[in-house]
Every structure is written in structure tokens, then in C-alpha cells.
Amino acid sequence: MDFSRVIFEDDYKSIRDSAKNFASEIVAPRAKQIDEDDKFFFDIIKKAGEMGILGIELPQNEGGAGADAISSVITTEEIASFSPVVASTIGAMRTHIMLLNKFGTQDQKKELLPRLVNGEGIAALGITEPNAGSDLSCLETTAKRKRDVFILNGSKTYTSFGNICDFIFVLAYTNKDLGTRNGMTLFIVKTGTKGLKVGPEEQKLGLRGMPLVSLTFDNLELEKENILGEEGNGFPQLMNCFDATRTDVAAQAIGISKSCLKICREYSSVRTQFNRPLIDFQAIQWMLVDMDVEIAAGRLLMHQAAHLRSQKSRCSREASRAKLFCSDNAMKHATNAIQILGGYGYLKSSPIEMLFRDAKVLQIYDGTNQIQRIILAREISKDEIK
């Protein structure tokens, strides 16, 4: 890959500048308030839609910006450096757009896609269950065919936007005998459908402002037209999106790490102890250097995965590497940033405190980092070491 293209090409510079302006002018002034109030930011998402950020990879003839995966992660990184929750929300919405555009029928896309792309509509994705997290084979939600309809029963937990969305992609077994790969189906369940119950909003450690709820389905009737694409394709459809989502998580992590480095450099330059700025002490210098090196290395891993995605090449290994490396480092950098800021870093008023809380989930969602290591171990065992 020609990385100079990512760094110097005018198109990418323009995209980075545009994302940086959006993040600094629209997102940054609201970031702290969003975290404190824990309220969703409809207006920011609407603005992101108007600017083409939500549908950045969607072809122009589908109403998107027609950009590539590298453009997508560039925007995510810039936004995450000011507000991880806004970046994470935009990443989730891009996933919903991708699912609908790749696998939806023409009627489904015509009805639902435009509102998602322009930021007026919101979707949710119901996958995780009380007994099914990393192991989706334990899924208990079922959609049993009864003549011309499917009867949906079960529950979902940790569903982002489940209480504010227009519709939900719900993963359910339609035929357990066919197993995980061929027996699961994604359904489009519209909000307000009889039999859908939405639980109270969860109180979270981080990503405050992104609502998280449980869902219950009680004999909820669905037509064949509610199937996303074709019956039995739910699991492969989701797996198809993970290369994108894991690369996006890497970008979120780099945004957090970059902010940690900036804050620490500024603080350590003005804070003095023993008649010297903190940045003059080798212990501090080495922590800052480690952040700088690991951010640069992580960005290369992220760009490699994004480049392969843009080329329509398989990049599961590269995406898992990027997600694992960048998210582990984001947590480490946020921890070290609190250490550098000392007692101030531990206060709610500290700029690091929110980043520390938001960083943790990057090691958990879109496949825990333990799962990423399992994936990479399998890849190493079967592929040539280059």
C-alpha cells in the first residue's frame, strides 16, 4: 500500500480538514455536556447526515458521499478525539446503513435508507442476549414460521438506540437445526409493533449520551417482507460487517489516544515540580514517547485494514489486529494520562476523566479483545507468516 497517498493526497487532506472542522465546531462545544446530561444528540447526528458523514461510503447514486474506507476512518479518528460517544454513534449508524444497503431489498432500501443517511432516521441492532454474547450459537430468540408469518419471541440486551429508533435489526433463529451459519435470520422490526417491549435505559460507565436498553419480543408477528434480504443469512450478513466495524473501533481508539497525548504534552509543559516542568523528567518523556509511537503504529494498522476494505479484499486479520492493538493502547494511554496529570486527572473536571471511561468499552464491543486474539491465533495457524 502507498501510505503517502493517505497522508498527502488532497482528497484525504480535504476530508480530514472537513471532519476536524465538524468535530471542533459542532461536537467539541457539546462533548462535556452530552457526557454530563446523558442525553442523545439528535441535532449533531442530523448535521452529520447533512455533511455526508453518515453515508460516507455509500455510493453517490444511493445518496451517499461515495468515499472509501480510508475516508471513513479518518473522519472517525477526528471526531473521536473530541467526543468518543459521537464517533461511536456515527460508527454504529454507518453499520446500519451498510447492512441495509448491502443486504436489503429494493423496497426496504427505498423506504428506510434515505432517512438513515440524512440523519433523520435512527436504527438499532439487536444481537446480544443475556446468555449469548461472544458465543452467538447460544442465541435464544426465535422466529418460528406460522403459515405466512414469523412469530418472534425472546429478548435482547445492551441494544444501543433501542428506545429512540425507528426500527431494529433483530437476529433470531429461524431454524436451529441448520446451526449458526445458516439457521439465523435478520429481521427488520419497526418501533411500535405489537409484542415489542422496550426496557428502561441502562446507566453506563462511559459513552454517556448513547442510550442502551433491553428488548423483549412476545409473540411479535413479522411478514416475510420484514426479513433483511433472505432467510438464513443473518449470521453471514453480520460477519460481513465486522471488518468495517473493527477498523472503525481502531479509529475511535486512535482518536482517544491522540487526545491523551495532546492533553499530557500541554499539561506537562506548564506544570512544574522540583523547579522543572514535568516534561523535563525522563519518566514523563518516556510515557509520552510510548503514546506517540503506539499511535503512529496503530494508525498504520488501521489504514492497512481500511485500504484492503476499499479494495474489496478480505481483511479480517488486519481489522482484528488494528482493533486489538489500538483499543488496548487507548486504555493504556488514558490510564497513563491520569498518572501524568496526577490528582487533577482523577477529578471529574479533568479532560482525561471522560476519555478514560469511554476507552474501556473499545476492548469489549465488536468482539472482545480476547476474541480478537482467538481470531488472530487461527489466522496465524493456517496462513503463511510473511
Residues covered by each model-derived region:
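A short core secondary-structure module
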Residues: N153-V198
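Long, acidic (Asp/Glu-rich), low-complexity accessory segments flanking structured domains
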Residues: D218-Q237
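Helix-loop "lid/cap" segments that line or gate small-molecule binding pockets
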Residues: R94-F103
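Flexible, small-/acidic-enriched active-site or ligand-binding loops
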Residues: C138, G192-E223
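Alpha-helical interface subdomain recognition
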Residues: M1-F82, V86, F103-Q108, R115-E120, ...
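Short Gly/Pro-enriched turn/cap motifs at secondary-structure boundaries
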Residues: T89, L116, N131-S134, Y158-F161, ...
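A short, Trp-centered hydrophobic/proline-enriched beta-strand micro-motif
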Residues: G119-I127, L171
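Short Ser/Thr-interspersed hydrophobic loop/turn segments at strand-loop and sheet-helix junctions
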Residues: G52, T76-A80, A172-Y173, V189-K194, ...
